[in-house]
Amino acid sequence: MGAPMTEAAATSGVLVEACVDSVESAVAAEQGGAGRVELCDNLIEGGTTPSAGAILECRERLRIPVFVMIRPRGGDFLYSDVEFEVMRRDIAVAKELGAHGVVFGILRRDGSVDVERTRVLVEEARPLAVTFHRAFDVCRDPVEALEALIALGIERVLTSGQAAKAEEGIPTIAALVRQGG
């Protein structure tokens, strides 16, 4: 169910993903050469789940894959039972509307990946692609977290190497890439 890459992405060998918070930004990202968009709302809050209308408009207007942020609110990545159920429903809606992937992250109070809840969301998201988002950057042990995510079958991790900027996290990112194979 993949969408074609843009010419720029196909010729450079590098897939550029743009994080966008509107349909207009998604269209501009595709026109600018992005090979995939991560559709969010409320980027000021670090990104939250976009509306069904925004997902549908992006799917209808774009030729590139649309990955949908699944995050019921800004703030930390510790979710109540009600928020977790909202995330499950939002994944079902994203699938129904034709998203190519979903992006989420759930942690436990001790700073580790909430493996049980993440497993449920991964299972419900399939066959969509799954990305674990920047919750990874506040986990207590990135090596342990990556092993947990690999075991869960998650294909992508969005990280700045636990630094404020990706440039500052390059050593950690490089180590994680080696670990992930």
Model-derived features with residue positions:
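N-terminal amphipathic alpha-helix/helix-capping segment at the start of soluble metabolic enzymes
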Residues: 1-19, 23, 59-60
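Conserved, mostly hydrophobic/aromatic
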Residues: 29, 94, 121, 133, ...
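Structural motif
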Residues: 32, 61, 97-98, 151-153, ...
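A short acidic, helix-capping loop that chelates divalent metal ions and anchors anionic groups
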Residues: 74-79
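Ordered, amphipathic secondary-structure segments that act as subunit-interaction surfaces
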Residues: 89-106
